[in-house]
UniProtKB/Swiss-Prot annotation:
Disulfide bonds: 377-383
A cellular-component GO term for this protein: extracellular region
Molecular function (Gene Ontology), one example: polygalacturonase activity
Coiled coil location: none
Glycosylation sites: 33, 73, 90, 140, 260, 292, 302, 407
Record keyword Secreted present: yes
GO biological process: cell wall organization; pectin catabolic process
Presence of the UniProt keyword 4Fe-4S in the record: no
Protein name listed in UniProt: Probable exopolygalacturonase C
Amino acid sequence: MPISKGIFLSLLSTLPLALAGHRSHRCVVPSSNGTRDDSPAIAKVFAQCATDSIIVFQEGVDYNVFQPIKAENLSNVEIRMHGNLHLPQNISAVQEIVKAGNSYWFTLEGPRVDWTGSEDINHGWINSYGQAWWDANPPNGTGIENRPHLLSYTTSDATIKYMRSRKPIAHNCRLHGDDITVTHAIVDAYSTGGFPFNTDGFDVAGTNIRISDSVMYNGDDAIAVGSGSHDIVFERNTIGYQSHGMSIGSLGKDPTDFANITNLRFEDVTVIDALYAARFKSWTGGQGLVKNVTWKNIRVFNVTFPIFVTQSYWDQGANRGDVDESSSVMMEDFTWSDFTGSINTYQPGDGSCASDPCWYNAGLPNLQHTEAIILECNTATSCKNFVTENIQLYPQSMDAPHLICMNATAELNPRLGFDCRNGMYTALSERH
Protein backbone atom coordinates (compact mmCIF):
# COMPACT_ATOMS: atom_id res chain seq x y z
CA MET A 1 0.00 0.00 0.00
CA PRO A 2 1.49 3.41 -0.92
CA ILE A 3 2.25 5.72 2.00
CA SER A 4 0.99 9.27 2.15
CA LYS A 5 3.21 12.22 1.47
CA GLY A 6 2.86 13.35 5.10
CA ILE A 7 4.05 10.02 6.49
CA PHE A 8 6.93 9.93 4.01
CA LEU A 9 8.09 13.41 5.02
CA SER A 10 7.81 12.46 8.69
CA LEU A 11 9.97 9.36 8.17
CA LEU A 12 12.44 11.38 6.13
CA SER A 13 12.77 13.94 8.92
CA THR A 14 13.89 11.23 11.37
CA LEU A 15 16.64 9.94 9.07
CA PRO A 16 19.35 12.37 10.27
CA LEU A 17 18.68 11.32 13.88
CA ALA A 18 18.98 7.65 12.99
CA LEU A 19 22.17 8.24 11.05
CA ALA A 20 23.58 10.34 13.90
CA GLY A 21 23.27 7.38 16.26
CA HIS A 22 24.94 4.86 13.93
CA ARG A 23 28.53 3.94 14.76
CA SER A 24 29.94 2.68 11.51
CA HIS A 25 33.59 2.22 12.50
CA ARG A 26 34.97 -0.47 14.81
CA CYS A 27 38.49 0.27 15.99
CA VAL A 28 40.46 -2.25 18.06
CA VAL A 29 43.21 -0.79 20.24
CA PRO A 30 46.47 -2.74 19.80
CA SER A 31 48.53 -3.77 22.80
CA SER A 32 52.22 -4.48 23.30
CA ASN A 33 51.29 -7.20 25.81
CA GLY A 34 53.19 -5.43 28.55
CA THR A 35 56.44 -4.92 26.64
CA ARG A 36 56.23 -1.12 26.19
CA ASP A 37 54.09 1.98 26.55
CA ASP A 38 50.77 1.63 24.69
CA SER A 39 49.83 5.32 25.04
CA PRO A 40 50.86 6.28 21.47
CA ALA A 41 48.74 3.48 20.01
CA ILE A 42 45.78 4.42 22.19
CA ALA A 43 46.05 8.10 21.26
CA LYS A 44 46.24 7.18 17.57
CA VAL A 45 43.04 5.14 17.73
CA PHE A 46 41.18 7.92 19.52
CA ALA A 47 42.35 10.39 16.87
CA GLN A 48 41.44 8.18 13.92
CA CYS A 49 38.11 6.99 15.35
CA ALA A 50 36.85 10.17 16.99
CA THR A 51 33.45 10.15 15.27
CA ASP A 52 30.70 7.53 14.86
CA SER A 53 32.96 4.76 16.16
CA ILE A 54 33.27 1.88 18.59
CA ILE A 55 36.71 1.83 20.23
CA VAL A 56 37.51 -1.60 21.65
CA PHE A 57 39.99 -2.44 24.40
CA GLN A 58 40.01 -6.22 24.07
CA GLU A 59 38.98 -8.53 26.89
CA GLY A 60 41.87 -10.31 28.57
CA VAL A 61 44.39 -7.81 27.19
CA ASP A 62 46.54 -5.47 29.31
CA TYR A 63 47.42 -1.95 28.19
CA ASN A 64 50.23 0.20 29.60
CA VAL A 65 49.08 3.83 29.65
CA PHE A 66 52.27 5.61 30.63
CA GLN A 67 51.35 9.02 29.18
CA PRO A 68 48.13 11.04 29.56
CA ILE A 69 45.45 10.48 26.92
CA LYS A 70 43.49 13.47 25.63
CA ALA A 71 40.54 12.86 23.32
CA GLU A 72 38.76 16.20 23.24
CA ASN A 73 36.92 16.09 19.92
CA LEU A 74 34.87 12.91 20.25
CA SER A 75 31.34 12.58 18.88
CA ASN A 76 29.03 9.56 19.02
CA VAL A 77 31.69 7.14 20.25
CA GLU A 78 31.38 4.03 22.39
CA ILE A 79 34.44 3.04 24.40
CA ARG A 80 34.31 -0.69 25.10
CA MET A 81 36.62 -1.09 28.05
CA HIS A 82 36.99 -4.87 28.22
CA GLY A 83 40.76 -4.88 28.73
CA ASN A 84 42.68 -3.73 31.81
CA LEU A 85 44.62 -0.47 31.86
CA HIS A 86 47.79 0.11 33.88
CA LEU A 87 49.16 3.52 34.81
CA PRO A 88 52.90 4.03 35.44
CA GLN A 89 54.29 3.22 38.88
CA ASN A 90 57.25 5.63 38.82
CA ILE A 91 56.00 8.38 41.16
CA SER A 92 58.65 10.99 40.35
CA ALA A 93 58.15 10.55 36.60
CA VAL A 94 54.40 11.00 36.94
CA GLN A 95 54.89 14.08 39.11
CA GLU A 96 56.96 15.67 36.34
CA ILE A 97 54.15 14.98 33.87
CA VAL A 98 51.60 16.57 36.21
CA LYS A 99 53.83 19.60 36.81
CA ALA A 100 53.91 20.09 33.05
CA GLY A 101 50.17 20.78 33.14
CA ASN A 102 48.49 17.39 32.90
CA SER A 103 46.02 17.35 35.79
CA TYR A 104 44.03 14.37 34.46
CA TRP A 105 45.43 11.13 33.06
CA PHE A 106 42.44 10.69 30.76
CA THR A 107 40.45 13.51 29.20
CA LEU A 108 37.35 12.59 27.21
CA GLU A 109 35.15 15.28 25.67
CA GLY A 110 32.28 15.37 23.22
CA PRO A 111 28.60 14.50 22.81
CA ARG A 112 27.33 10.92 23.09
CA VAL A 113 30.52 9.39 24.46
CA ASP A 114 29.48 6.06 26.01
CA TRP A 115 31.62 3.83 28.23
CA THR A 116 30.81 0.12 28.29
CA GLY A 117 32.93 -2.01 30.58
CA SER A 118 32.99 -5.77 30.77
CA GLU A 119 30.27 -7.52 32.76
CA ASP A 120 33.01 -9.91 33.94
CA ILE A 121 34.36 -8.51 37.23
CA ASN A 122 37.92 -9.54 36.27
CA HIS A 123 38.05 -7.24 33.26
CA GLY A 124 37.59 -3.57 32.48
CA TRP A 125 39.72 -2.21 35.34
CA ILE A 126 41.83 0.94 35.40
CA ASN A 127 44.76 0.21 37.72
CA SER A 128 46.33 3.42 39.03
CA TYR A 129 48.56 1.93 41.76
CA GLY A 130 47.66 4.64 44.24
CA GLN A 131 48.81 2.70 47.31
CA ALA A 132 52.44 3.74 46.86
CA TRP A 133 51.37 7.39 46.60
CA TRP A 134 49.30 7.20 49.77
CA ASP A 135 52.10 5.47 51.66
CA ALA A 136 54.55 8.20 50.57
CA ASN A 137 52.52 10.90 52.29
CA PRO A 138 54.58 12.34 55.20
CA PRO A 139 53.21 12.54 58.76
CA ASN A 140 50.60 15.31 59.04
CA GLY A 141 50.62 15.72 55.28
CA THR A 142 47.47 15.82 53.16
CA GLY A 143 48.83 14.00 50.12
CA ILE A 144 52.09 14.42 48.24
CA GLU A 145 52.34 17.07 45.53
CA ASN A 146 51.53 16.67 41.85
CA ARG A 147 49.15 13.73 42.09
CA PRO A 148 47.24 13.09 38.87
CA HIS A 149 43.47 12.89 38.84
CA LEU A 150 42.25 9.94 36.84
CA LEU A 151 39.49 10.94 34.44
CA SER A 152 37.86 14.13 33.19
CA TYR A 153 34.70 13.12 31.34
CA THR A 154 32.62 15.82 29.63
CA THR A 155 29.72 14.60 27.52
CA SER A 156 25.96 14.61 26.94
CA ASP A 157 23.33 11.99 26.10
CA ALA A 158 25.68 9.28 27.31
CA THR A 159 25.69 6.02 29.25
CA ILE A 160 28.54 4.79 31.45
CA LYS A 161 28.31 1.13 32.48
CA TYR A 162 30.70 -1.09 34.43
CA MET A 163 33.42 1.54 34.86
CA ARG A 164 35.94 0.07 37.31
CA SER A 165 38.76 1.94 39.02
CA ARG A 166 41.28 0.34 41.38
CA LYS A 167 43.31 2.56 43.73
CA PRO A 168 42.98 5.92 41.95
CA ILE A 169 45.79 8.21 43.06
CA ALA A 170 43.52 11.23 43.64
CA HIS A 171 40.12 12.19 42.17
CA ASN A 172 38.54 9.34 40.25
CA CYS A 173 36.13 11.01 37.81
CA ARG A 174 35.16 14.59 37.07
CA LEU A 175 31.81 14.09 35.32
CA HIS A 176 30.36 17.17 33.65
CA GLY A 177 27.53 17.42 31.14
CA ASP A 178 23.86 16.72 30.60
CA ASP A 179 21.69 13.61 30.34
CA ILE A 180 24.25 11.09 31.62
CA THR A 181 23.51 7.73 33.24
CA VAL A 182 26.12 5.83 35.28
CA THR A 183 25.42 2.26 36.40
CA HIS A 184 27.41 -0.57 38.01
CA ALA A 185 30.56 1.49 38.59
CA ILE A 186 33.21 0.46 41.12
CA VAL A 187 35.68 2.84 42.75
CA ASP A 188 38.05 0.93 45.03
CA ALA A 189 40.41 3.22 46.94
CA TYR A 190 40.69 0.97 49.97
CA SER A 191 44.12 1.48 51.53
CA THR A 192 46.29 -1.01 53.40
CA GLY A 193 48.56 1.80 54.63
CA GLY A 194 48.51 5.59 54.23
CA PHE A 195 45.24 7.48 53.98
CA PRO A 196 43.92 7.86 50.39
CA PHE A 197 43.50 11.63 50.41
CA ASN A 198 41.21 13.28 47.84
CA THR A 199 40.06 10.06 46.21
CA ASP A 200 36.64 11.48 45.28
CA GLY A 201 34.40 9.03 43.45
CA PHE A 202 32.43 11.30 41.11
CA ASP A 203 32.63 15.09 41.09
CA VAL A 204 29.46 16.04 39.25
CA ALA A 205 28.20 19.18 37.53
CA GLY A 206 25.45 19.37 34.92
CA THR A 207 21.79 18.55 34.36
CA ASN A 208 19.98 15.21 34.53
CA ILE A 209 22.81 13.01 35.77
CA ARG A 210 21.96 9.69 37.43
CA ILE A 211 24.38 7.36 39.25
CA SER A 212 22.97 4.04 40.42
CA ASP A 213 23.77 0.45 41.44
CA SER A 214 27.42 1.26 42.11
CA VAL A 215 30.04 0.72 44.82
CA MET A 216 32.50 3.37 46.04
CA TYR A 217 35.06 2.74 48.77
CA ASN A 218 37.31 5.75 49.11
CA GLY A 219 38.80 8.49 51.27
CA ASP A 220 36.75 11.49 50.18
CA ASP A 221 33.29 12.24 48.78
CA ALA A 222 31.61 9.32 47.05
CA ILE A 223 29.75 11.97 45.08
CA ALA A 224 30.36 15.70 45.26
CA VAL A 225 27.73 17.83 43.54
CA GLY A 226 29.09 21.14 42.31
CA SER A 227 27.56 24.45 41.33
CA GLY A 228 25.48 24.49 38.17
CA SER A 229 23.96 21.08 38.90
CA HIS A 230 20.26 20.35 38.44
CA ASP A 231 18.19 17.16 38.49
CA ILE A 232 20.85 14.85 39.94
CA VAL A 233 19.96 11.37 41.25
CA PHE A 234 22.22 9.09 43.32
CA GLU A 235 20.40 5.86 44.16
CA ARG A 236 20.82 2.18 45.08
CA ASN A 237 24.52 2.60 45.80
CA THR A 238 26.89 1.29 48.48
CA ILE A 239 29.58 3.64 49.74
CA GLY A 240 32.12 3.38 52.51
CA TYR A 241 35.61 2.66 53.79
CA GLN A 242 36.57 6.19 55.00
CA SER A 243 34.18 7.94 52.65
CA HIS A 244 33.06 11.52 53.10
CA GLY A 245 29.66 10.53 51.86
CA MET A 246 27.04 12.06 49.60
CA SER A 247 28.15 15.68 49.50
CA ILE A 248 26.98 18.95 48.10
CA GLY A 249 29.87 21.35 47.67
CA SER A 250 32.01 22.72 48.82
CA LEU A 251 30.33 25.93 47.63
CA GLY A 252 31.10 29.61 48.04
CA LYS A 253 34.86 29.50 48.44
CA ASP A 254 35.05 32.28 45.85
CA PRO A 255 32.66 34.96 47.19
CA THR A 256 32.11 36.31 43.67
CA ASP A 257 30.91 32.94 42.29
CA PHE A 258 27.12 32.57 42.80
CA ALA A 259 26.29 28.92 43.54
CA ASN A 260 23.19 27.52 41.83
CA ILE A 261 21.94 23.97 42.50
CA THR A 262 18.40 22.55 42.33
CA ASN A 263 16.61 19.20 42.49
CA LEU A 264 18.93 16.60 44.02
CA ARG A 265 17.83 13.18 45.25
CA PHE A 266 19.98 10.70 47.19
CA GLU A 267 17.97 7.55 47.87
CA ASP A 268 18.34 3.92 48.92
CA VAL A 269 22.04 4.13 49.80
CA THR A 270 24.07 2.06 52.28
CA VAL A 271 26.96 3.85 54.02
CA ILE A 272 29.59 1.76 55.84
CA ASP A 273 32.46 2.95 58.13
CA ALA A 274 32.33 6.45 56.66
CA LEU A 275 33.11 9.85 58.15
CA TYR A 276 29.92 11.38 56.71
CA ALA A 277 26.74 10.07 55.12
CA ALA A 278 24.58 13.06 54.07
CA ARG A 279 26.67 16.21 53.91
CA PHE A 280 26.36 19.85 52.83
CA LYS A 281 29.38 22.14 52.94
CA SER A 282 29.64 25.82 52.04
CA TRP A 283 32.07 28.53 53.01
CA THR A 284 31.30 31.54 55.17
CA GLY A 285 31.11 34.56 52.88
CA GLY A 286 29.75 32.60 49.92
CA GLN A 287 26.72 33.48 47.81
CA GLY A 288 24.07 31.42 46.03
CA LEU A 289 21.04 29.16 46.46
CA VAL A 290 20.70 25.39 46.80
CA LYS A 291 17.07 24.27 46.64
CA ASN A 292 14.99 21.08 46.71
CA VAL A 293 17.35 18.41 48.05
CA THR A 294 16.34 15.04 49.52
CA TRP A 295 18.23 12.24 51.26
CA LYS A 296 15.85 9.31 51.74
CA ASN A 297 16.14 5.70 52.89
CA ILE A 298 19.77 5.92 54.00
CA ARG A 299 21.27 3.03 55.98
CA VAL A 300 24.39 3.86 58.00
CA PHE A 301 26.73 1.49 59.81
CA ASN A 302 29.52 2.90 62.00
CA VAL A 303 29.31 6.44 60.57
CA THR A 304 30.73 9.39 62.53
CA PHE A 305 28.44 12.14 61.18
CA PRO A 306 25.27 10.68 59.62
CA ILE A 307 23.56 14.04 58.90
CA PHE A 308 25.83 17.04 58.64
CA VAL A 309 25.35 20.60 57.41
CA THR A 310 27.92 23.35 57.70
CA GLN A 311 27.77 26.81 56.20
CA SER A 312 31.16 27.59 57.71
CA TYR A 313 33.28 24.97 55.95
CA TRP A 314 36.95 24.92 56.84
CA ASP A 315 39.84 23.48 54.85
CA GLN A 316 42.99 22.64 56.80
CA GLY A 317 45.06 23.65 53.76
CA ALA A 318 43.37 26.97 52.86
CA ASN A 319 43.81 30.60 53.93
CA ARG A 320 41.05 32.87 52.58
CA GLY A 321 41.77 36.09 54.43
CA ASP A 322 38.89 38.44 55.29
CA VAL A 323 35.36 37.42 54.22
CA ASP A 324 31.86 38.72 54.90
CA GLU A 325 30.80 36.59 57.86
CA SER A 326 27.11 37.42 57.32
CA SER A 327 27.01 36.11 53.73
CA SER A 328 26.04 32.48 53.02
CA VAL A 329 25.04 30.10 50.26
CA MET A 330 21.30 29.87 51.03
CA MET A 331 19.69 26.47 51.62
CA GLU A 332 15.97 25.90 50.96
CA ASP A 333 13.64 22.88 50.90
CA PHE A 334 15.98 20.21 52.30
CA THR A 335 14.60 16.86 53.50
CA TRP A 336 16.26 14.02 55.41
CA SER A 337 13.96 11.02 55.84
CA ASP A 338 14.17 7.36 56.83
CA PHE A 339 17.72 7.25 58.21
CA THR A 340 18.58 4.08 60.14
CA GLY A 341 21.73 2.64 61.69
CA SER A 342 24.67 3.24 64.01
CA ILE A 343 26.80 6.26 64.91
CA ASN A 344 30.56 5.69 65.31
CA THR A 345 31.04 6.36 69.02
CA TYR A 346 34.19 4.43 69.87
CA GLN A 347 36.58 5.28 67.01
CA PRO A 348 35.14 8.42 65.42
CA GLY A 349 36.79 10.26 62.56
CA ASP A 350 39.07 8.94 59.85
CA GLY A 351 42.71 9.03 58.77
CA SER A 352 42.51 12.45 57.10
CA CYS A 353 43.23 14.43 60.27
CA ALA A 354 46.35 16.57 59.78
CA SER A 355 45.65 19.45 62.16
CA ASP A 356 44.70 20.15 65.77
CA PRO A 357 41.78 20.20 66.13
CA CYS A 358 41.02 17.82 63.30
CA TRP A 359 39.40 19.64 60.40
CA TYR A 360 36.18 17.68 60.84
CA ASN A 361 35.96 18.63 64.53
CA ALA A 362 36.74 22.33 64.01
CA GLY A 363 34.01 24.58 65.40
CA LEU A 364 32.45 21.70 67.35
CA PRO A 365 34.23 21.82 70.73
CA ASN A 366 31.64 19.83 72.69
CA LEU A 367 31.34 16.80 70.44
CA GLN A 368 30.29 13.60 72.19
CA HIS A 369 30.18 11.48 69.03
CA THR A 370 26.65 10.52 69.78
CA GLU A 371 25.33 13.16 67.37
CA ALA A 372 22.75 11.94 64.88
CA ILE A 373 22.28 15.40 63.37
CA ILE A 374 24.53 18.44 63.09
CA LEU A 375 23.08 21.55 61.44
CA GLU A 376 25.35 24.60 61.39
CA CYS A 377 23.38 27.36 59.68
CA ASN A 378 25.48 30.49 59.38
CA THR A 379 22.67 32.99 60.06
CA ALA A 380 19.05 32.94 61.22
CA THR A 381 17.88 33.34 57.61
CA SER A 382 20.26 31.09 55.65
CA CYS A 383 18.32 27.82 56.20
CA LYS A 384 14.67 27.55 55.15
CA ASN A 385 12.11 24.73 55.00
CA PHE A 386 14.26 21.99 56.52
CA VAL A 387 12.38 18.72 57.15
CA THR A 388 13.42 15.58 59.06
CA GLU A 389 11.30 12.43 59.19
CA ASN A 390 11.82 9.01 60.77
CA ILE A 391 15.40 9.44 61.96
CA GLN A 392 16.30 6.17 63.69
CA LEU A 393 20.01 6.52 64.48
CA TYR A 394 21.71 5.20 67.60
CA PRO A 395 25.21 5.60 69.08
CA GLN A 396 27.23 2.41 69.39
CA SER A 397 27.58 3.20 73.10
CA MET A 398 23.78 2.92 73.35
CA ASP A 399 23.63 6.38 74.90
CA ALA A 400 20.81 8.61 73.75
CA PRO A 401 21.42 10.25 70.35
CA HIS A 402 22.27 13.94 70.45
CA LEU A 403 22.18 16.86 68.06
CA ILE A 404 23.94 20.14 67.42
CA CYS A 405 21.76 22.78 65.80
CA MET A 406 22.47 26.44 65.10
CA ASN A 407 20.16 29.04 63.54
CA ALA A 408 17.60 26.69 61.93
CA THR A 409 14.76 28.80 63.29
CA ALA A 410 11.27 27.43 63.92
CA GLU A 411 9.79 30.35 62.01
CA LEU A 412 11.57 29.43 58.76
CA ASN A 413 11.62 25.67 59.44
CA PRO A 414 8.19 24.71 60.85
CA ARG A 415 8.65 21.02 59.90
CA LEU A 416 12.20 20.65 61.18
CA GLY A 417 11.04 17.80 63.41
CA PHE A 418 12.92 18.82 66.57
CA ASP A 419 13.83 21.89 68.57
CA CYS A 420 16.96 23.53 67.15
CA ARG A 421 19.35 23.45 70.09
CA ASN A 422 22.32 21.50 71.38
CA GLY A 423 21.47 18.45 73.42
CA MET A 424 19.58 15.19 73.35
CA TYR A 425 17.78 14.43 70.10
CA THR A 426 14.07 13.86 70.48
CA ALA A 427 11.77 13.99 67.50
CA LEU A 428 8.77 16.24 68.12
CA SER A 429 6.49 13.41 67.01
CA GLU A 430 7.80 11.29 69.91
CA ARG A 431 6.77 13.78 72.58
CA HIS A 432 3.56 13.41 74.51
